[in-house]
Amino acid sequence: MNPSDAIEAIEKPLSSLPYSLSRHILEHLRKLTSHEPVIGIMGKSGAGKSSLCNALFQGEVTPVSDVHAGTREVRRFRLSGHGHSMVITDLPGVGESRDRDAEYEALYRDILPELDLVLWLIKADDRALSVDEYFWRHILHWGHQRVLFVVTQADKTEPCHEWDMAGIQPSPAQAQNIREKTEAVFRLFRPVHPVVAVSARTGWELDTLVSALMTALPDHAASPLMTRLQDELCTESVRGQAREQFTGAVDRIFDTVESVCVASVARTVLRAVRDTVVSVARAVWNWIFF
């Protein structure tokens, strides 16, 4: 079965519904299966944005036309492969001049609705977080639910010479300091999502970050983003999580339809179709995204 056949199998049960109703549902299903996730990456210079993206994602890289906001450019890159793609947006502002606060706030108000999630990177050995805190509270104060904080370069946590390269893990002393760092970041920012510490260089805790990333993503973005993960990070657990998020998104397409269901369609009929579509979506998920 190819992706087109899989999508057709999801759509087939809709034939028992009135045309206008089935068309409405079909449009949402097609948007769902063709969604291109957009992930924002932000953090001060040296936080390791490129290293983390390379450790997490794969695909043919092509530049996307930059977004201009005042004198600022927001760089965007598309990662493509096997019929699916995602866009990474490099977000400016953190650690730059406060003279441009109004400009940055306008930029983020414009661009944040386009993003499925923002990864905010903070170096493990960065103790000067007042700039990050200011940006969080004054520039991005209305977009907190879309942000996942990541403590990067955990292998550089003191005492850095104790990092266990063979076991790819921190020493007990480093582990304690990493815990204290993530707890400090959480206390300072009070984010919606948990703070995750990783080492992109060694691969330590990247699987934990992927799990947090999938959970933080809107359900409609989880499966297409999963297709761009590095192979070793796309585990059965991650696939299972993405599959459930996808079927949940399919299920919710029917919520608005059912709430305004026209008299020509009995709710029992619509619910039967809904159950069938969701069941088929779960069954053919693998053919859509792999």
PLM features: residue spans?
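Switch II of P-loop NTPase G domains
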Residues: 71-74, 91-141
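Conserved G1/Walker A P-loop phosphate-binding module
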Residues: 1-91, 287-289
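P-loop NTP-binding site
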Residues: 210-217, 231-290
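Alpha-helical scaffold elements adjacent to nucleotide-binding pockets in ATP/GTP-utilizing enzyme cores
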Residues: 55, 110, 114, 131-138, ...
